[in-house]
Amino acid sequence: LKKYKINAIIAEVEDKIKYKRQPLVGSSDALTIEEWKKLSEYAHERNISISPLVQGLGHASFVLKHEKYKDLRDDPESDWAFNPLDPKTYEVQYDLYRDALEALPHGKYLHVGGDEVKTTGRNSGKSALELQLIWLNKVCQFAEEAGRTPIFWDDMPLKQTGVYRPMFRPEMSKAKVDSIWNTNQEKLEAFLPQFPKNCIYMRWNYHSPEAYGNTKTMQWFRDHGLKVMGATA
């Protein structure tokens, strides 16, 4: 990686850390925090920083599959997502963050995940987007207080307000994309005050990053004073 001038890596750690604060979460083949530190130091000596991605709000089966954490599920029958309205959700997630940041001390970022998830807050009556932004603001505040820049997968706010599809349709005409945005943009912008400004919105698109719908979305973030980063792999 040094040869190719790579200077930063996001490592999706999930259960591959032997967590000290929530030891049940680490898998049997997980690396210890000290082993991760050695890897981080090795990379740092080569001008490469490693930052952790600790999955939440969804992709949380590595935590919620355990009996101990079942009460934190958004849907009691599914281990996919945390309940963003339960304060204990944040106690657990922050413990995982603390250990991950200790394991990877040279990173600049804390990637909090947040993709491919829709929650109800145990049928709270709040919308999925409202709930996600409640969660996002809390975890972004934690990241900032820990000295890290939070990164968030941006797909769900876009999907829940109807502007997601054009990003993956490079054959869609500019006029059609603009029409979809003109119809739905107001729904997205109604939530703008709740979008944390200290966050990087990571615009992932592995198949059609050049699509007009994708570049238009990235420009929307910039136009509204939000930081955006592309992820093509």
Regions found by a protein language model. Name each.
Residues K2, E41-E45, L101-P105, E189-P196, ...:
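Acidic (Asp/Glu)-rich catalytic clusters
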Residues I151-W220:
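Substrate-binding cleft/loops of secretory-pathway carbohydrate-active enzymes
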